[in-house]
Amino acid sequence: VTAAQFMRLQPQQQGVSNWQHFNNCCNAGGLSDAQKEVCNMLAADYILANTDRHLGNFGFLRDSETLEWKGLAPIYDSGTSLWQMTLTRAISADAMVPAKPFETSQQSQLKLIAPYVDLPLERLDGFSGKAKDILEDAAQFDDGRAAKIAAAVEGRIQMFRLNRA
């Protein structure tokens, strides 16, 4: 069930933000951990500069027999990540990157979600180097693009750490 469909569990009251309405629907569906799980997903989107996490690009699992809500579906559709449509020279950790679904910029969405994220950030140590190696081996990039993406990912990891402190 997409998040857009899930958010129809109850009507959105006037003056209630989409973020608060989403959390109200999670509570109504008995999914108390969903806020944390969505924040973790959006944190990954921030680090990878995913620009297309709209309400149709994540969702929830239900038991097909009992219709009980089971939780957040695994992450899917991250195809507009890693500065995919950005010229190499413009790739930067602090560049303005649009966000969805709860804010319009990734910086403002990061401020919204940071208090709820519980990712073990120490597991990201060395991630940007591994990403660089994978991109250099697998992709048909121009010279320096993999290194530029890796540096930007590392910068975003560091900015995320600062926002969590």
Q: Would you name each region that the model predicts?
A:
Residues 1-50, 54-55, 59-165:
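Anionic ligand-binding catalytic core segments
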